[in-house]
Amino acid sequence: MRKTLLKASVLCLMLSGFISRASLFAQSDPTGKKPITSTYAITNATVFAKPGSEGSKATILIKDGVIKGVGSNLSLPVEAKVIAGDSLFIYPGFIDGASQAGITKPEDPKRPDNFDSSKPSDEIAGITPWRSAVDQFSIDGSQVDAMRQAGFTLIQIVPEGGMIAGKSALVILGDDKSTNVIKENTSLSSNLNGARGMYPGTTVGVMAKFRDVYKNTELTKNRTATFASNTGVVRPEITPTYQAMMDVISGQVPVLFEVGNDLEVRRALSLKNELGFQLILTGLEEYENVIDLLKSSGTKVLIQLAVPDDKAIKAKEGEDESEEVKALKARVKASYDKAIAQAGKLEAAGVPFAFTTIGAKPNDLMKSLKTMIEAGLSEEAALAALTTNAADILGVSKFAGSIESGKMANLVLATGPIFEEDSQIKHVVVDGKIFEYETKAKKKKEGAEGSGGAIAGTWDYTSETPAGSSGGKITIAKDGSSYSGTITYDDPAGSGAATSDLEDISYEGSSLTFSFGVSAGGMNLKVDVSAEVSGNTMDGSMIIGEFGSFPISGTLNPTLIANK
């Protein structure tokens, strides 16, 4: 029922013109026509073949989705379409170790009339190892567009679900006319989240249930072998759960275990040590206290490609702030500094790691990575986490993770060195298909206050949708060092205009960000807006939960000033 309402809400929003397809993401073939050639030569670009390598001028020859050559004196076939790369910097396509881009959660099963919360069925309790992320994935989702624009070309998709959600898979973010599936059943997705209002509802209960499922699968496997080779033996009971768990207990696929902090890391490791399954830890957010344990255990690690919100620590001190408030801000800053320095400490300890983007906004991924670099992570380690380390962890180094002849043509083409402040991604090549993105000249930051122009006032904004153009007004007022405001939009219920308060307004350099809520079809949706301000105009995108990123633009009305 919840999923039905959510779909209805999104449909209402789309029909009202509030959200749109990502038209900012201008792809290389807007007409949808089949390209006349599958052979490309990107000439005289600065190529970084792998982390740690120095950039060198080279040409990359691509044919049928495969890199055919990398060098300065390549002989190019006559059918090759030449792309001048003189001002471009090329990197291996980024790899996401665990992603839910393009994933839609299946509807929750209906509880029977005689439901017993102490003995729920596996499916109702969130134990669904037979489910596949491929069945929940769509390449058409705007989240996929946003991830690709951020440089990601290959991702391990993770199914939505409960404590044992199902089978992950490897997909490329390529042509929507292809299945894009590289490999199904790459890992079993699991976590320590209990079921609501039923067993197992606690972390201890989840661990006990996982142990029970694992052990019963082992027994079923042994009994099946005995039944197949002997007569007079009772037939074993084979359930969908036990059947789907067979690859895990036989060591053919690892368990991708989501853990957020050091305690959850220890619990997942204890299950692994007791039961003997292969393990990849994902979603690590607070892990400094277990870095030595991660190193000694040799566990494969995917950390969150996200950093905590820093708005609170950047707020200016007020003259009337109490010592208690100042002390609280100091503790918040210390906690923030500790969080962003963890990746650098993981590198220093010699623990190879990659990233998961689950829970992060595509538009913020590079910003988060640059923050980690400023806090001590080397650029080489950052690039390795996006490429070679991720390929090693996922077992795809044979065809991905670096720029070499014979590997898949997955590339990121940027306007400058990838971690430089003003560098932007201009092209992304996925499986030989070239996607092109708009780049804009960015102004450098000039202190905490925005340099892109004043933002206080009333903005007329528009958003292009499948139903046409629609919009409203954004009103922003400045009060000291902070901002407040409202936004109007077409009410999804069809009753005229609706208004919502703006939250978390931030304006630094030329970058404006804020969020607000939309009520539609009985659901509350959070919208995050990120835009670049230039004079009296802004252009950017808005992210709506799992539905991805959509374009928004606006013009400041100078006659309607909202300063306090």
Regions found by a protein language model. Give the residues of each.
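Bacterial Sec-dependent N-terminal signal peptides
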Residues: 1-30
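Acidic, glycine-enriched loop/beta-strand segments at the rims
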Residues: 28-34, 47-59, 72, 378-386, ...
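Histidine-rich, glycine-flanked metal-binding segment
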Residues: 32-33, 38, 47, 51-93, ...
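His/Asp/Glu-enriched, well-ordered alpha-helical/loop segment
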Residues: 44, 106-107, 113-122, 254, ...
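Polyanionic/metal-chelating signatures
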Residues: 140-286, 424, 430, 437-438
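Active-site core of metal-dependent hydrolases
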Residues: 158, 231-338, 353-356, 392-394, ...
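Central antiparallel beta-sheet cores of small beta-barrel/beta-sandwich binding domains
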Residues: 454-533, 539-555, 563
